[in-house]
Amino acid sequence: VPTTKASFYARLGVLSPDEIITKLRGVNTPTGGFIEGADVHGFELIPTIMADAYPSGPATRDVFDAILEELLEGIRNAGDIDGVLLELHGSMVIENLDDGEGYILSAVRDLIGPNTPVVAQLDIHSNVSHQMVEMADVLIGRESYPEVDMAPRGRECADVLVRIIREGLRPTMALHQIPMMWGMNQVTAHSPMKEAIEELHRIESLPGVVCGSIATCFPLADVPDLGASVYIVTEN
């Protein structure tokens, strides 16, 4: 069953820039965390588009291209920006395109150039590719399933972006893909994910480590980058 334009409207729909701030302020979503971060740090958010669909088959190329162009047009119209915050999933598949997020990040990078930082928030069920890591400055994944930490992870993205812009943080990101598929229901309050997240937090406490994430993978996507992974961001 392909993901079509109707698939997006069946869930949360496609929100306009004006609707994004008003409808998602104070809501436990990554963008809700972006908004909180903007309020706390005192920077201006310029929303572009939000499009959210239930997981299904590959998205049709015309729908994907239309959504991506609206995102890019919003960035163009924003003028002289200091950075980009993106709420992505991490396992989007398009007709004849296996790495939707890698393509999105590449398109954003081509538009804004190499010196404007891009920080993106990902689902814990991500198939993280090397292209995604190469095109973003920082990727931060959610750490809970059920996913109750969406706003905190969005806030963390905003915090890291502020560190890059105002404090000169120079993030370096590394990805290790694990040849393993974990089931969709790896509850992080139970073993073995509980211990894996605890070890992740231990690594994050080490000097020079900015943040780290574990992706359990999205096992229903038949793509080359299918699989669990760990990605870590350090200072320079």
What spans do the regions from the language model cover?
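Internal, active-site/partner-interface "lid" segment
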Residues: 165-194
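Hard-cation-handling environments
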Residues: 184-236
